[in-house]
Each structure stands twice: as C-alpha cells, then as structure tokens.
Amino acid sequence: FIAEDAGIDTLLVDFAFIKPANAAFFNRFKHKILVRGEGGIEPLGEGVAFDEFLQRGKNNSPTHTRNPIIPDVILYTSGTTARPKGVMLNESHFWANTEGAMAHVPFLKDDRVIMALPLFHSYGSIIALIALRGGATLILSRQFAPKGILGNIAKYKATILPLAPTIYSFLVDLYKRGGYDVSSLKYCVSGSAALPVALLH
C-alpha cells in the first residue's frame, strides 16, 4: 500500500530480505539498488549492487540549495485506526526534533547507540539523525531480539539505549535472570508511548 500510495519507483533493499515469496513485489519497481549481505536469492533480474551504484556516481558533489520548508521525507503512520497516512516532513521538523532531544540527552562522538528501533518510524529516524549529528556510533540490529540487544550492549560497550516501553519490559524481565553486563549504559531513552512509572523504577 505504501509503495503505491507514495508513487515509489526506486527501491533500496538489503539483499537478505529478498525471498521467493516477495520477489514479485520487488520486481514491481523500475529501479532496484541491492545492498549485499548474507542470505537472499537472485530473483530480481535487473538491479545494481550498492557498491556499483556508488562507483557509477560522479566524484563532484551536486550543488544543493537548502530550503528548510520543502518536504524531504514522507513517513507513514502506523495505521492503527485507519490506513497509514503519509506525513510530509521537512528539514525544519527534523532540526526541531533533534535540537529538543539533544538538550536533554547529549549524543557525543564517543557514544555508542544501540539502534533496535525501526528506521521507517519517526522515533527511530530521529534517534539515528541525533546520533549522526553528534558523531556517535550507531550499532544497528537487523531484527528485534531481546537477548541480542542485551548482548550487544556488553559486546560494544553501548552507552545509549533508545527503545519503546514495551521493549524495555521484555529486557527488564530478561536482565533479572542474570548474565548480562549493562554497566556501560549512560542513558536509556524511552519514546513512542508513555513509560509506566512501575517500569521506570
């Protein structure tokens, strides 16, 4: 629905997500850019690998005139009450969001941020922009797995963990069983829904 509603003609897709069951969907797009990784199949016919896509580009950066009120991104709502709706966001929106968040939680160049949030939602995309703006390192999670999140905190000495309250409840229950080192964390950021007081404590 979203692809048709937004009139998308170019798809940037991780190779691992290409399966026989969804090959027909991917082949609907005029242009396909494939990010090579583990897994995946070769059903797409025409397409270009991401590295090749970058090599084909010109070395000089194109001239870009900033206009903070022109829409840059269309993010779709979750569609819990009706069909998802495309929300047009511009540079001013993203700037205000990142400024407001960084006033409370500074993301610095030495920080390592666990990114287990979906990047196609506003919460995840804003957190990613804040981290990049502050020069922090993003530790991307391919899928939601509580054990994987706790394991990555210890493995990469993560300092910032942004999640939704529901996910925190899973992690707290798992953490109570022992065996996970989260001592490197400086901030746990909660968003997308109200955080219950009991969970906070």
Where would I find each of the regions flagged by the language model?
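Conserved AMP-binding/adenylation subdomain of ANL enzymes
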Residues: 95-112, 120-160, 170, 174-175
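Conserved pre-ATP/AMP-binding loop-to-beta segment of ANL
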Residues: 51-76, 83, 106-112
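Adenylate-forming
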Residues: 13-23, 39, 117, 144, ...
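Structural core segment of the AMP-binding/adenylate-forming
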Residues: 1-52
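Conserved AMP-binding A3 loop
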Residues: 72-96
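Short hydrophobic/charged patches on amphipathic alpha-helices used for structural packing
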Residues: 63, 75, 147-150, 177
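A short helix->loop->beta-strand "cap" motif at the edges of active sites that frequently abuts
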Residues: 27-32, 136, 183-186
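Conserved S/T- and glycine-rich ATP-binding loop of Class I adenylate-forming
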Residues: 11, 71, 77-80, 113, ...
